[in-house]
């Protein structure tokens, strides 16, 4: 839509900078807050901020300036990252120590259901918009979140995830080599996805293939739903059913497979071999392999994180995740604008290789 309004790919990417930048800061600080105050508080702060962000969008249309919407988007991004970090850290405290198979299963379910619901949200948002109008839709969503917020205040344990020892602010940076290596891999993994998925792909589908907004939005929404479903199945795919719990070597192998598939897509598009079919099918295969990578990484960070103050390591890791999204989004706009879609795919290949 913004591309049709005359925005360049790089200008479109810049619209997301506020959101992604605050994701980096939120995860870094949020992990420390979770360990210091407890994950129940960071979860509730996130819910409250999301209600505020939605309420900001319920103002009259003439007040919905670009700055106002970007501010609401930034608050919403902070809220989302606080809730995600809190939920994934909490699983470490709820699953009995040593039960790595159960930990992997619950991390995969949480990660996959989150993304499947995100995809379903595209369709639900469209339904609410047509039924209640824009203001009515955001008010309805804020109302549902308010009910969840009240339940969270009543039922979440007060000491959930709170570190037993004093937590210094300097501890926001991980001292664990395993966490640092995994965080760097996560940064390049999500950079590999977003460098062609966020800006380049939607514009390419509309500009080159002539797809309208409904087709592009519906296709990507269904992709996200399928991506989430595959994430929930990742433990079965990676061998948990045979009693094996994957490790860092497994993550390297899946990242290598992702790089191979992306390189194959790039080659086929470079030589103009049925590009529309190649991208549609290639994106499905890429999404399935990426989903396993993402779910596997999400399990490994919670497994590697120390028991006391788990959110410190998880927050640092998801800071790297947000940094990868920020890097990928910026490059998606700039590389597509200057070099084209195929170049975005080759940058994705390079990032996938670095993930290994």
Regions found by a protein language model. Name each.
Residues 1-10, 199-216:
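Short amphipathic helix-loop junctions that connect adjacent transmembrane helices
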Residues 14-32, 221-234:
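Central cavity-lining transmembrane alpha-helices of secondary-active solute carriers
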Residues 24-61:
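Conserved MFS/SLC helix-loop-helix module at the cytosolic interface between two early adjacent transmembrane helices
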Residues 26-39, 129, 230-247, 336:
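Helix-to-loop junctions at the C-terminal end of transmembrane segments
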Residues 48-63, 256-273:
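C-terminal ends and interior cores of transmembrane alpha-helices
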Residues 53, 65-83, 276-292:
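Hydrophobic core of transmembrane alpha-helices in multi-pass small-molecule transporters
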Residues 72-114:
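Cytoplasmic helix-loop-helix junction between adjacent transmembrane helices
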Residues 155-191, 207:
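Juxtamembrane intracellular "pre-TM" segments in multi-pass secondary transporters
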């Amino acid at each position: 839509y913004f591309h049709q309004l005359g925005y360049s790919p790089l200008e479109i990417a810049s619209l997301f900078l506020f959101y992604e930048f605050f994701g980096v800061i939120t995860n870094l600080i949020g992990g420390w807050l979770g360990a210091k105050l407890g994950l129940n508080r960071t979860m509730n702060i996130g819910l409250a901020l999301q209600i505020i962000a939605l309420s900001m969008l319920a103002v009259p249309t003439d007040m919905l300036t670009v700055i106002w919407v970007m501010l609401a988007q930034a608050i919403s991004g902070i809220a989302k990252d606080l809730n995600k970090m809190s939920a994934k850290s909490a699983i470490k405290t709820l699953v009995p120590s040593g039960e790595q198979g159960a930990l992997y299963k619950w991390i995969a379910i949480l990660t996959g259901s989150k993304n499947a619901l995100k995809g379903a949200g595209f369709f639900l948002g469209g339904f609410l918009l047509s039924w209640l109008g824009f203001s009515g839709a955001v008010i309805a969503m804020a109302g549902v979140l308010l009910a969840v917020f009240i339940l969270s205040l009543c039922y979440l344990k007060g000491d959930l995830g709170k570190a037993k020892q004093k937590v210094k602010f300097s501890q926001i940076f991980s001292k664990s080599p395993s966490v640092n290596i995994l965080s760097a891999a996560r940064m390049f993994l999500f950079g590999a996805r977003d460098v062609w998925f966020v800006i380049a792909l939607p514009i390419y589908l509309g500009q080159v293939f002539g797809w309208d907004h409904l087709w592009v939005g519906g296709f990507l929404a269904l992709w996200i739903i399928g991506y989430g479903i595959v994430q929930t199945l990742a433990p079965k795919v990676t061998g948990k059913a045979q009693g094996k719990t994957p490790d860092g070597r497994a993550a390297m192998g899946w990242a290598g497979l992702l790089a191979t598939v992306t390189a194959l897509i790039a080659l086929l598009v470079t030589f103009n071999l049925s590009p529309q079919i190649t991208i549609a099918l290639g994106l499905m295969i890429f999404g399935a392999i990426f989903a396993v990578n993402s779910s596997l990484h999400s399990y490994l960070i919670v497994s590697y994180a120390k028991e006391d103050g788990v959110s410190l390591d998880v927050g640092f890791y998801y800071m790297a995740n947000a940094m990868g999204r920020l890097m990928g989004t910026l490059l998606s706009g700039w590389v597509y604008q200057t070099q084209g879609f195929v170049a975005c795919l080759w940058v994705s290949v390079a990032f996938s290789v670095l993930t290994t």
